[in-house]
Amino acid sequence: MKITKIEKKKRLYLIELDNDESLYVTEDTIVRFMLSKDKVLDNDQLEDMKHFAQLSYGKNLALYFLSFQQRSNKQVADYLRKHEIEEHIIPDIITQLQEEQWIDDTKLADTYIRQNQLNGDKGPQVLKQKLLQKGIASHDIDPILSQTDFSQLAQKVSQKLFDKYQEKLPPKALKDKITQALLTKGFSYDLAKHSLNHLNFDQDNQEIENLLDKELDKQYRKLSRKYDGYTLKQKLYQALYRKGYNSDDINCKLRNYL
């Protein structure tokens, strides 16, 4: 087969053959196989060229994808599939990228966890789940998590939550709120409870009473639209108790309120 035309098309070259076949190749392919117009290729040379062209094009795609941020092996492979790189070539591309240190799942996991320590608010359980979703294996994640101390981060997150809710909730509800938030963010129960020891939950009676008054007004506006009488009183009691207020304080307020 003879090459009848070579034409540059943006980042690729269009090659046309005298058997009416055409294909796109990278500049690396042109150089490697010393392609030029009127060059004759046998079947083996043509297949070698096609394979290398796919490999070269796929690698260029992957490098473009990696230029924005670190990616896992799986993320790169999925990206190549999306761009219709042949399945049997993808492992070769991944291997080359690994050998040249463009991709490394262990380093990616380490960087992700370190960045979270500096700027994030996630505990180890959520971090692991997010890394698994990126296609990183547990054996690349677990050693890094086990060597990472999350106690200071848990304290930092708990302090931020404390500052946000301390003027809105009584001590018991505030503790529950912070604990549940930390659990949701992936911290262990022990770490969540330990982080509370660094916070001052002391509130004087007047502060608690003011909070109770505000919450009672809020719940009354909401519940009085649907209930009245004894049922309203019960609903108010239940709502306030769930918020963490003392039972005696609630009953006292309700006697004077209704």
Swiss-Prot record:
InterPro entries: RecX_HTH_1st (IPR053926), RecX_HTH_2nd (IPR053924), RecX_HTH_3rd (IPR053925), Regulatory_RecX (IPR003783), WH-like_DNA-bd_sf (IPR036388). GO terms for biological process: regulation of DNA repair. Keywords: Cytoplasm. The keyword ATP-binding does not apply. It comes from the Bacteria. Transmembrane segments: none annotated. The keyword Membrane does not apply. Its main location: cytoplasm. It is found in: Cytoplasm. GO terms for cellular component: cytoplasm. Modulates RecA activity. Belongs to the RecX family. This is Regulatory protein RecX. The gene is recX.
